[in-house]
């Protein structure tokens, strides 16, 4: 239905696009066909509310949690966040009964049951359930290692690898084998150890 209303367009969103020609103008907002490839632009482009869209660009977060001080763009996001403090998990999966604090977490979880993987790597075609997993995967192709150890300068592709590496410097071994009680610096080392334990038991 055409109301004659001009579509809301944001110059800041357009600047963020890698390919402005890929824009589709629909009724009240801009939709980019390749929004998964547009860094930091997916939400603004899919948001029909000019005020919320503006906050995303300016960084304004007027809704603050009284418990922890965390701030949000939208009141609905604050409402969902409060569930963490109250322990309430309002969003329940009809398939398996798992419950979640946020609707977005339930949406991601449902992809496990449906097998849906909407985020695809343009380099190799591998698909992922979450955009964050795709972003992490892309580092394999670029050889980018943005996470650097302040102690020794060693760099890593993933933040979790840096966190585990840091355990070497501080002497922490947070991964414990439930079978024998042995502690490990790396989760991968614990996994190998557990396989050996299992193999010994079945031999």
From Swiss-Prot:
Gene Ontology biological process terms in this record: regulation of DNA-templated transcription
First and last residues of each zinc finger (C2H2-type): 63-85, 91-113, 119-141, 147-169, 175-197
Alphabetical list of InterPro entries matching this protein: C2H2-ZF_Transcription_Reg, Znf_C2H2_sf, Znf_C2H2_type
A Gene Ontology term for the protein's cellular component: nucleus
Any one GO MF annotation of this record: RNA polymerase II cis-regulatory region sequence-specific DNA binding
Location within or outside the cell: Nucleus
UniProt keyword list: DNA-binding, Metal-binding, Nucleus, Repeat, Transcription, Transcription regulation, Zinc, Zinc-finger
SUPFAM superfamilies: beta-beta-alpha zinc fingers
Gene3D superfamilies: Classic Zinc Finger
SMART domains named among the record's database cross-references: ZnF_C2H2 (SM00355)
Keyword Transport included in the entry's annotation: no
Pfam families: zf-C2H2 (PF00096)
Family affiliation: Belongs to the krueppel C2H2-type zinc-finger protein family.
Described function: May be involved in transcriptional regulation.
Name of this chain's protein: Putative zinc finger protein 876
Species, as recorded: Homo sapiens
């Amino acid at each position: 239905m055409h109301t004659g209303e001009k579509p809301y367009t944001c110059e800041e969103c357009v600047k963020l696009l890698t390919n402005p020609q890929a824009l589709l103008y629909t009724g009240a907002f801009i939709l980019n066909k390749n929004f998964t490839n547009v860094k930091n632009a997916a939400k603004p482009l899919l948001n029909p509310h000019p005020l919320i869209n503006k906050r995303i660009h300016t960084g304004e977060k007027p809704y603050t949690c009284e418990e922890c001080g965390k701030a949000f763009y939208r009141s609905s996001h604050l409402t969902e966040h409060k569930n963490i403090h109250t322990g309430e998990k309002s969003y329940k999966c009809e398939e398996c009964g798992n419950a979640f604090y946020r609707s977005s977490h339930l949406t991601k979880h449902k992809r496990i049951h449906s097998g849906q993987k909407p985020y695809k790597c343009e380099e190799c075609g591998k698909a992922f359930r979450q955009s964050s997993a795709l972003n992490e995967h892309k580092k394999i192709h670029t050889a980018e290692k943005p996470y650097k150890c302040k102690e020794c300068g060693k760099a890593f592709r993933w933040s979790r690898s840096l966190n585990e590496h840091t355990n070497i410097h501080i002497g922490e071994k947070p991964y414990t084998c439930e079978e024998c009680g042995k502690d490990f610096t790396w989760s991968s080392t614990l996994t190998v150890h557990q396989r050996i334990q299992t193999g010994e038991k079945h031999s």
